[in-house]
Amino acid sequence: LFSEIVRRRSARITGGQDGELDMNGTPREVLGKLGLNMLRFITRADSLSFHRVMVAEAVRVPELGRIFYAQGPGRVYGGLANYLGCATRRGELSCPKPELAAKLFLGAIVANNQLLGLVAPGFEPFKGKKMRAHVEEAVELFLARYGPSQ
């Protein structure tokens, strides 16, 4: 049951049916949608509360932490790495190490936004235009490094 709850929560981030990314979308579209969904999701009050509980309980119940990672963040990283590999094979990107590229992109999205929400009482996450601007900048940064070879 716990595994299914976490899997469904991670599906909200990818935004696709059953949590799958649009494997035929352009990198800019897929990364932009994923980035915005992720940033919105991880800065929500309920997501921050859930994350706090997971960090606290994973020490006491390691299996809970493993399930959380596998069905949550690990699933999102894996789905993105799979997409990046496909886009590279189509010539839309140049990602020799899709797993690393996925972690770097999602790290740029998360930045310090989740940490602020976790430890700063009353933190008000940025919304709207500022959130979109953050995601667009992360996408531009990613494409500058991993865009197709010229």
Each language-model region and where it sits:
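Residues that scaffold the ATP/ADP-binding catalytic core of kinase and kinase-like folds
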Residues: E4, I13, G117-L118
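Amphipathic alpha-helical packing segments from all-alpha helical-bundle domains
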Residues: E29, R40-S49, V53-V55, E63-R89, ...
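Hydrophobic alpha-helical connector segments
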Residues: R9, G15-H51, P98-F105
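Short beta-strand "wing" residues that participate in macromolecule-binding interfaces
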Residues: C95
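Alpha-helical DNA-contacting segments of helix-turn-helix folds
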Residues: L1-R9
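Short linear capping/connector segments at secondary-structure termini
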Residues: G16-E20, R52-A56, Y69, V119-P125
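C-terminal peripheral helix-coil segments that are non-catalytic and often amphipathic
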Residues: K33, N37, G74, G78, ...
